[in-house]
């Protein structure tokens, strides 16, 4: 198998969607599966690398085939968002689609907004929204709320690597934030408003980057379907290794590759400690963890 698939190969790699507002992440995955069928390509496993709220637009990495084994690493990566905090009303969902729960006539100045941002940079404790996909005793929090239950969501420590004010008007402020996994932008917006002694909600949310994947690499669903109908879906595919740009490649011999494919440890490896991508020529063999001079398989690939 080569790294560049032919028009009839099963797809193994990443398609980066520019998800539109109003579409759920699961719906987006279903659309990719439909595109694969339209293109007449072999059926493969498909999954996304990080839920994006229906309200939000932007970068949604979709893993195909063997790349689904790496989706968990995409979930753990940092994300970059642009979001608008509309002042005046807080909602139960913390976005524009929810019911108003609190209101205030107070509007902060630009200077006041900028003065509180330092409070949210670095590691902070955050309470996720009750309208979220977080599981509580096996059931999503949002489903429990809709069923009429009173829900308490536990707080968590997250990291805001960067937070800047991008635009401001008397009724709203737009920010750019680079955040760690597990961060809820809706909660961040709520907390910024509270720090300013007012109320607010997210009126706009766009993911600009997810791990190594950027908006420049993302395509719309319309473009995806167009390429599928033209039999050119493979041209939209990024290689499996594109999701691991911060993980070094480790060249292995054919004998070593065979051992790794059988799940065996390699002894006497000269490589950086930590995660490495074992490669036989141009073919991904396994994601391995190196400790000392020993390597063990974390994820093996069937190529």
UniProtKB/Swiss-Prot annotation:
- Sorted alphabetically, which keywords does the UniProt record give? Isomerase, tRNA processing
- Which Gene Ontology terms describe the biological processes this protein takes part in? mRNA pseudouridine synthesis; tRNA pseudouridine synthesis
- Does this entry carry the keyword Isomerase? yes
A molecular function (GO) held by this record is: tRNA pseudouridine(55) synthase activity
Reactions catalysed, semicolon-separated, are: uridine(55) in tRNA = pseudouridine(55) in tRNA
| UniProt xrefs under Gene3D superfamilies | Pseudouridine synthase
Q: What is its EC number?
A: 5.4.99.25
> Does the entry feature the keyword Disulfide bond, yes or no?
no
Q: Which residues form the active site?
A: 53 (nucleophile)
Describe the function of this protein. Responsible for synthesis of pseudouridine from uracil-55 in the psi GC loop of transfer RNAs.
Q: Report the NCBIfam families cross-referenced here.
A: TruB (TIGR00431)
Describe the family membership recorded for this protein in Swiss-Prot or TrEMBL. Answer: Belongs to the pseudouridine synthase TruB family. Type 1 subfamily.
Record protein name field? tRNA pseudouridine synthase B
Please name the gene that encodes this protein.
Answer: truB
